Amino acid sequence: MTNKNSPNPNIEMGGQCNKPYACDYQDRCKSLLPKSDITPFTVLPYIGKDKKLIEFMKSQGTTDLQKVPSKFFRDRKDYAPGYHKIIQDHHKNNKPWFSLDLKNIFKEFSFPFYFMDFETVTQGVPIIKGTKPYYHLPFQWSVHKLESIDKEIKLNDAESFLDFEDQDIERKFIESLLKAVGEHGTVFVHSSFEKSVLDKLKDKDNCKDLADKIDKLISRLKDTLKIVRKNFYSPLMNGKYTIKNIIKAIPSNISYDV
């Protein structure tokens, strides 16, 4: 429970804002900070919260991303080589970065393209037979279809599924999904979440007869998170690779702003 009229804590933002859980009011605190044209070093994935880097930047009296020495940069196999340097450089020139491979990567994918997203819910007291407390129950999917490169995806063209109470919800979820994505084309997801849901569904007693079809769907999945991490960055993303941040950086008529 919170008191909206209580004063803001007289303490600087720091690691405590995310421990033991992320505070829901960080945006409120950030809005009170002095406005600055400086991009903070905390946008750097993984090392932005590194204790040694934080102590170094404190000793220098700055939070400026451009002041981070390269000795702190680290490579990760799921990101572009030198991605910390890429982020630093492209915040400096305020331009997006593309790998030379990006165009060729998409040439390898076959149309139609399907863009698939799942939502799950955890129930403290499960109401669906065969589930347990805090089991991730899939209750919603949406699929947007792109027939060819010269077509345009419209939001109202999406197919979707939504159910909360049907005792056979998982069976209906996967049956309707398999029908929506057909048997051909490339299915894009953002992260491994959708695959993990499909893997669990094919082992459910009421879905085992669909296991082969689910496996074929899984074989068509392409993870856009992996593609973006290795091949694209924009200062508008502020070091984050979520769909909400990527949308800000690419030409689109879609917005997550409320």
Predicted regions and their residues:
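Cysteine-cluster motifs in flexible loop/terminal segments that predominantly coordinate metals
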Residues: 2-40
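Conserved RNase H-like, two-metal-ion catalytic cores of nucleic-acid enzymes
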Residues: 97-183
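Conserved DEDDh/DEDDy metal-dependent 3′-5′ exonuclease domain
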Residues: 1, 156-258
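Short conserved micro-motifs at the rims of enzyme active sites and ligand-binding pockets
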Residues: 30-36, 125-128, 231-237, 258
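Short coil/turn segments at secondary-structure boundaries
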Residues: 9-17, 101-106, 258
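Helix-hairpin-helix
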Residues: 34-84
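Flexible loop/turn segments at secondary-structure boundaries
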Residues: 32, 96, 121-125, 150-152, ...
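Charged, flexible boundary elements
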Residues: 79-105
